[in-house]
Amino acid sequence: MKVSDFDYELPESHIARYPPDERGSTRLLVLQRSTGEIMHSRYAGLHGFLRKGDLLVLNNSRVVKARMFAFKPTGGKIELVLLEKHGDEQNLVLYRGSLKKGDALLAYGCEFGVEELVGQGVAVLSVKGEGTVQDVFERYAAMPIPPYLKREAEEIDRERYQTVFAEQPGSVAAPTASLNMTGELFDSLRQKGVSIASMTLHVGLGTFLPIRVDHFDEHVMHREFYVIPDETIALIRTTKNNGGRVIAVGTTVTRALEHAADVVFNSNGNGSVSGEADIFIYPGYRFRVIDALLTNFHAPRSTVLMLTAAFAGAEKLFHAYAEALRWEYDFLSYGDSMLIL
């Protein structure tokens, strides 16, 4: 297969521009990989498709406020977008405008210094005075909602472009498969005997980018920092040993777990594992950790669409997408979801 095989027509009318009125009220398309059978349900009914002994793995990364404008002392306007966290500090920005090392930038009474230019349109910033670059962005910047929403961030996005269990700040895009998780759904899952575990992967802007080459081996995958706690690794091992299923909530969880598969299945390994997930998953990949996937409906030519096709099977996935369009499902970050079993 080629990248062009993952192009499809997504009508603008099927892109959800805003979150649903009530969190968790979206629809859920369920696809059985073994048969290709499709069922239509609700996200709030997820527990009805899981079994006692299954394990749900969530990404607890928190979206940080990441988009603001700053000004040079001469008056030049520079757009800044904070990039995802790698390690301890979050001080890399994507900038639009003209910058050079040593420049000063003013924003909201704060002064940034351009410490270094590290790539096309990417700079390392520092901030004068107390606090960090991340502190300034958290105080004054806007939420970094996806560009395909074609609108500015609004007050509703501060709450709804964030999961209810977000803990670890560092993402500049939400792990959207779990945006519709609610406390009530967690209660229903636990009552059924489904275990819930978490890990952290800080989602980057690369998640929105279409692939611009036509051969998989020509694409350079973006890297995202992740941490999988020891208790989550232990739960995965126990679930597998007892015949349960590991359900990844989202492509971010999938990438982290599959990238760390060697450690997950190393019975002598102890402690948490961290790394930079640069794994590019596309049809032909053999999954080692996950047994089911809860995810959104993805954009054409995106790496997350190819990952989903690798898990579901491309033919079955595109049949499911055609059905979703026919039944008027909403696509992308604020839209409906699919569960692939």
UniProtKB/Swiss-Prot annotation:
GO MF annotation list: S-adenosylmethionine:tRNA ribosyltransferase-isomerase activity
Keywords: Cytoplasm, Queuosine biosynthesis, S-adenosyl-L-methionine, Transferase
A GO biological process held by the record: tRNA wobble guanine modification
Database matches in Pfam families: Queuosine_synth
Domain of life according to the entry: Bacteria
Entry EC number(s): 2.4.99.17
GO cellular component, one term: cytoplasm
Reactions performed catalytically: 7-aminomethyl-7-carbaguanosine(34) in tRNA + S-adenosyl-L-methionine = epoxyqueuosine(34) in tRNA + adenine + L-methionine + 2 H(+)
Matching SUPFAM superfamilies: QueA-like
Keyword S-adenosyl-L-methionine attributed: yes
EC category: transferase
Involved pathway(s): tRNA modification; tRNA-queuosine biosynthesis
Location of the protein in the cell: Cytoplasm
InterPro entries, A to Z: QueA (IPR003699), QueA_dom1 (IPR042118), QueA_dom2 (IPR042119), QueA_sf (IPR036100)
Known partners and oligomeric status: Monomer.
Family: Belongs to the QueA family.
Function summary: Transfers and isomerizes the ribose moiety from AdoMet to the 7-aminomethyl group of 7-deazaguanine (preQ1-tRNA) to give epoxyqueuosine (oQ-tRNA).
Name by which UniProt lists this protein: S-adenosylmethionine:tRNA ribosyltransferase-isomerase
Organism of provenance: Chlorobium phaeobacteroides (strain DSM 266 / SMG 266 / 2430)
Gene: queA
